[in-house]
Amino acid sequence: MKVLVNGQLIEYRKEGGGPAVLLLHGWGATLGTFDQLAAHLVKTGHTVYRFDFPGFGSSPHPGAAWSVGEYVDLTAAFIEKMKIKKLKAVAGHSFGGRVIIKGVATGKLRPERLILMAAAGIRPKPTFKKAAFTAIAKTGKVVTALPGLAGVRQKLQKKLYSAAGSSDYLQAGAMQQIFINTIKEDLTEYLDEITQPTLLVWGEHDTETPLSDGKIMQQHIASAELVVVPQAGHFVYDDDFGASVTAID
């Protein structure tokens, strides 16, 4: 289904009946990533809402270089558009968790409960790899723009960005500037503003948003519980759906 929200055409789903739950997907994913979780929540008596963020799935690119703040505003407007008066919980994975953190901390999202699965938002300390990514990304734009290199532009960029260790940036395409705007924002200071009960679900072997991020969030969010799923990675709800659902229930 489609709905116009803040001037953006949004692909969304609404299923079930009962208390409202909103699911927010991660970077590069779509609303379909939560098919299994949505089905479970519907069976347990919930109305489940989910949508493709602008620039992902079937929702067009927003047309501008958005930051996390614009995605928060879009999410708040979606809730209003759906006429959700009381949101029992909002659950998000990775980038979706980033949107939840900023949205709740600023009072724009007001769920009764938060479920953050491998949530992004903690900016890592500078490392050689991160510095290399920044330098190589800039160099890549300059080098591949030189006369005579037009034919090898894409291949050279791929090698440069892969050397920098950022497949997400390489795969971002038209979303590259939004990706940059997103990852450069550290949300640590926002965590202290969250007062709602918060469940943190983390994969033991997550390398994208490491378990140390979950522990930092647990320290800063007053009513946070951290559940670590053994052997699971970044996509914790796929790697061990049973353990993830048990924690959420």
How would you label these PLM feature ranges?
Residues 127, 139-196:
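Conserved alpha/beta-hydrolase catalytic His-Asp/Glu region
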Residues 101-106, 111-145:
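Flexible "cap/lid" loop of the alpha/beta hydrolase fold
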Residues 8, 13-58:
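Conserved HGGG/HGGXW glycine-rich cap/lid loop of the alpha/beta-hydrolase fold
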Residues 194, 200-202, 206:
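Short beta-strand/loop motif that positions the catalytic acidic residue
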Residues 43, 47-91, 246:
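Active-site loop/oxyanion-hole signature of alpha/beta-hydrolase fold enzymes
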Residues 238-249:
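Post-His helix in hydrolase/transferase enzymes
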Residues 92-96, 100:
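Gly/Ala-rich beta-loop-alpha elbow adjacent to hydrolase catalytic centers
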Residues 207-213:
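Conserved alpha/beta-hydrolase "acid-adjacent" motif
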